[in-house]
């Protein structure tokens, strides 16, 4: 599944419009290039409709909101819906402030998303209308664990069914569901929490995956999540040369 989805990205080179945050914009662009996609960044309201029109997908990330970018998100999102383009929402920090929460909830209500990807606290905020997000990180009390896995799976399947899109909850254990099926992915790495932006990068990459695999959004999303975890695993695992030097 991963190989086929990634091969389709490399073969089709999907152009992805990213309205993302200022902290990770360069990293998101580079990850899109690395996986085989093509990035373009724009949040100016007078520009976004034209940019969205020439792209195959739209990645909306609310990490550094301002009035201009919020307006641009709604214009781009509605244009993407009009053109039947694939759209992903990354509700960064939803639950941490009224502006973030209100914006994320309104986006989810007014725009038809194919995928919503976030940590467990952000997704709970969207589903329940309030949350306990710790800044832009998930609250420890919300974390998906082996002990609460059944409840977490039931929650994500229920919200996916109600929202009508694929929901991806990422963390130490990742959950990806369309309301009927749920992938449980256990290749998260603790090192990923030591740098900022891995979630933002994943959202950009996931958008490329769903554009290149339009008939298999659930599988494409799960494949993107797996790919990110495997990339981190390969990077953090000692090479044979490193192991020999450590003896």
Regions found by a protein language model. Name each.
Residues 1-41:
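Glycine-rich phosphate/adenosyl-contacting loop at the front of the ribokinase-like
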Residues 36-78:
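Active-site cofactor/substrate anionic-group-binding motifs, chiefly glycine-
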Residues 39, 87-88, 167:
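Hydrophobic beta-strand scaffold residues
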Residues 79-86, 165:
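A short helix->loop->beta-strand "cap" motif at the edges of active sites that frequently abuts
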Residues 100-182:
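Conserved phosphate/ATP/ADP-binding segment of small-molecule kinases
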Residues 125, 196-217, 221-226:
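Short, small-residue alpha-helix embedded
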Residues 186-196:
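Short pre-catalytic strand/loop immediately N-terminal to key active-site residues, enriched for Gly-Thr
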Residues 235-242:
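Conserved small/polar residues in nucleotide/adenosyl-binding loops
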């Amino acid at each position: 599944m991963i190989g086929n989805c990634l091969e389709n990205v490399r073969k089709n080179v999907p152009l992805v419009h990213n309205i993302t945050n200022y902290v990770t914009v360069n990293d998101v662009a580079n990850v899109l290039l690395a996986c085989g996609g093509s990035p373009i960044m724009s949040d100016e309201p007078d520009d976004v409709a034209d940019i969205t029109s020439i792209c195959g997908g739209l990645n909306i990330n609310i990490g550094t909101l301002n009035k201009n970018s919020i307006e641009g998100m709604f214009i781009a999102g509605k244009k993407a819906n009009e053109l039947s383009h694939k759209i992903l929402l990354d509700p960064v920090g939803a639950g941490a402030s009224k502006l973030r929460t209100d914006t994320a909830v309104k986006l989810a209500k007014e725009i038809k998303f194919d995928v919503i990807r976030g940590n467990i606290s952000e997704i709970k905020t969207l589903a329940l209308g309030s949350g306990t997000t710790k800044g832009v990180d998930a609250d420890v009390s919300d974390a998906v664990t082996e002990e609460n896995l059944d409840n977490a799976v039931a929650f994500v399947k229920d919200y996916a069914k109600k929202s009508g899109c694929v929901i991806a909850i990422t963390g130490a254990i990742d959950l990806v569901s369309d309301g009927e099926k749920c992938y449980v992915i256990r290749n998260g790495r603790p090192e990923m929490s030591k740098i900022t932006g891995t979630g933002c990068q994943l959202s950009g990459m996931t958008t490329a995956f769903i554009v290149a695999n339009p008939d298999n959004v659930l599988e494409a999303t799960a494949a993107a999540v797996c790919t990110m975890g495997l990339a981190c695993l390969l990077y953090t695992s000692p090479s044979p040369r490193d192991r020999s030097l450590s003896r």
